[in-house]
Amino acid sequence: MENLIEKLKKAKVSSYTLALLNTNEKNEALRAIANNIEKNIDKIIKENEKDLKRGEEKGLSKAVLDRILLNEKRLRDIIKSIDDVIKLPDPVGEIVSMQKRPNGILVGQMRVPIGVIAIIYEARPNVTVDATILALKSGNAIVLRGSSDALNSNIIITEIMKEALSNTKVPPDTVQIIESPEHSVVEELLQMVDYIDVAIPRGSAKFIKHVMNISKVPVIETGAGNNHIYVEEDADFEMARKIIINAKVQRPSVCNAIEKLLIHKNIAEEFLPIIAKDLREYNVEIRGCKRTLKILTDAIPATEEDWYTEYLDYIIAIKIVESIDEAIEHINKYNTKHSEAIITKDYYKALKFLRMVDAAAVYVNASTRFTDGGEFGLGAEIGISTQKLHARGPMGLKELTTTKYVILGEGQIRE
């Protein structure tokens, strides 16, 4: 417990120094991190292999092992994402608005760092870098608590980043890692309102709900992705096939992959066998509603639990719907408010879907796989918020700041 508090104290104190640094000083620190990661790619891969071996011994699924995996390509993608963040404008110090009052004072809002951010995440060691670079560029200290399944990877990456910071203006203590695998440490961390300004959980819906239930620290809810694609009766079949396959099988273990497919009843008999054949070429297990089972007789019956489930695997549940209204109603009942898509040629139906579906990202004729900080031009993201207050959708630099009022006067007093 003392060790935890000591780490949090260091992060808090360092956050004040970081908040004073200019953009060039912060960018130099990010560049140093990128260079040091590149120098140590082999070392990171070696530690990552330990996590993968341990995961295989534990019987982790292929989807989870894929989330843990760091190969040279993924590490070079991480390095590129750091370069992308360096190029982004720094929101800190930006005056959001300024107005002159009748008495002559100027009243405005300035963007400032949140302070100390704790991120609690499951088996994704790339988050260790993404969270750190975004936090540092936006002037925040970061406390990292990753999954024990990627512990070796997270530790070596953090050591490499802190080593890089030791030769920059950014204090290495602005980056802290909680190495203990004990769940009780997470509960302790989430009570530390004197040191942590906000907590961001990333993981399954069950995990995120648990964090929100036990935390005294303010929490930004991030997204599990029980995502849907709805195929309207006027949809272009070739477009629909391409989008569905990309959204389901390109990388099924990530939160912007789809888990459910809704199909208008008027095209179900023609389209279902086509898309089922496509999905089965990738060994996707198909579950379906009663109407789906009449067309795909070898599909597995979908249960009520299926409609709520984020599989993160080669599994999809299919439902035939009467109309766009039923599709929207179904999505809003079962989704996790992450990413939803419609495939249609009808402008008005597309507009209705955009307006009525409750999600952080809503698509027309495109794959949900684009819900990502890099794809949205944010460089990277610390998480994808599925709540409606403070931030919604991929959280980049601006979302890791808050505002304070700044008032400029020339001796005015209130009469």
UniProtKB/Swiss-Prot annotation:
Transmembrane segments: none annotated. PROSITE patterns: PROA. Pathway: Amino-acid biosynthesis; L-proline biosynthesis; L-glutamate 5-semialdehyde from L-glutamate: step 2/2. CDD domains: ALDH_F18-19_ProA-GPR. One of its GO terms (cellular component) is cytoplasm. It is an enzyme of class 1 (oxidoreductase). Its main location: cytoplasm. It catalyses: L-glutamate 5-semialdehyde + phosphate + NADP(+) = L-glutamyl 5-phosphate + NADPH + H(+). The keyword Transport does not apply. It is found in: Cytoplasm. Keywords: Amino-acid biosynthesis, Cytoplasm, NADP, Oxidoreductase, Proline biosynthesis. Its EC number is 1.2.1.41. GO terms for molecular function: glutamate-5-semialdehyde dehydrogenase activity; NADP binding. GO terms for biological process: L-proline biosynthetic process. Catalyzes the NADPH-dependent reduction of L-glutamate 5-phosphate into L-glutamate 5-semialdehyde and phosphate. The product spontaneously undergoes cyclization to form 1-pyrroline-5-carboxylate. Belongs to the gamma-glutamyl phosphate reductase family. This is Gamma-glutamyl phosphate reductase. The gene is proA.
